[in-house]
């Protein structure tokens, strides 16, 4: 899967091309969509669990907290084919932690990994405006952000 190979290939390429050692590397993560807002399907959970032993710790199940839906669930049922129900928890994935864990697995020490930790989908400025662009939250109609990879000789 792509999500696993980005960190592995990036660090592998740096080792081959530049002789970089993981213990000498610094990494910064974020901002990015947080586990609070990043819902995924069962297939994503399955893919992660097939590749990472720690995958279960990356997922949380979020249940609808609407008290009316909780008290009167039959009011919100829709006629859907078997197996296509949206009743049940949303599965949320912590991509930021997933990336941090992959960097650790690649040999970087925890002290060399900085995490911003702000969610691009829900972090707001004091005036209520978005602090970041969020492709997922804004359905693709967004500005852009920049990431930088550099090397100091």
Residue ranges and their predicted role:
Residues 1-153:
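Active-site microenvironment for binding and transforming phosphate-containing groups
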């Amino acid at each position: 899967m792509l999500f696993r190979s980005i960190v592995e290939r990036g660090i592998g390429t740096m080792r081959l091309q530049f002789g970089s050692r993981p213990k000498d590397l610094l990494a910064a993560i974020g901002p990015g969509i947080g586990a609070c807002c990043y819902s995924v399907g069962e297939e994503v959970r399955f893919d992660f669990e097939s590749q990472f032993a720690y995958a279960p710790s990356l997922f949380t199940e979020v249940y609808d907290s609407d008290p009316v839906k909780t008290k009167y669930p039959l009011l919100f049922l829709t006629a859907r084919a078997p197996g296509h129900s949206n009743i049940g928890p949303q599965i949320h994935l912590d991509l930021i932690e997933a990336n941090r864990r992959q960097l650790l697995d690649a040999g970087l020490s925890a002290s060399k990994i900085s995490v911003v930790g702000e969610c691009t989908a829900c972090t707001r400025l004091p005036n209520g405006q978005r602090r970041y662009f969020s492709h997922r939250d804004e359905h693709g109609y967004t500005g852009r952000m920049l990431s930088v990879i550099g090397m100091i000789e």
